[in-house]
Amino acid sequence: MKKYIICFCSIKSKGLNCVNEYNKVIQQKINPPAPDKPEMKVKTTVFRQGDRVMQTKNNEFVSNGETGIIVSIEKDEDEELLCGIKFDGKHDTIWYDIEDMSNITLAYSITIHKSQGSEYKTVIMPMMKSFFIMLKRNLLYTAVTRAKSKVIIVGQKQTIFIAVNKTETDKRNTQLGARI
């Protein structure tokens, strides 16, 4: 399965302009509920057959950050729901029970950090003043360079100028010097 369009956000779970909220809205437009479409609810997330998803924690078969499509949701012999996911670049379908699905998230929208190392045909990037702390040149560069064909930036023009001109990066206190 090729990666066509992805929406990048700076923030995962705070406010209306975050990855989690965008995923819900995009899912409703691209893969709405239907009587013949199986679903699996895990905590507050509803997964449907056909959803684009991402692994969030390494396991035996799949690494953190890998994406795929839910190809099947069905019950096993004990009437427990199982979710089959076909990950990009893998031949086999990987099966998850409800507990394992806690390491899966919708992937219509992802953070810029999660996008590193991946490419997409089209990138849609919301840039809002509410992302002020994340408006940095290096993040804009990362987002733009993930696109193979097209970048669509949505938001206030001023936010692009802020990001382009904000070159300082946060100083990280890793204590690396003390550990060496």
Predicted features along the sequence, with ranges:
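Core RecA-like ATPase module of SF1/SF2 helicases and allied nucleic-acid translocases
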Residues: 1-180
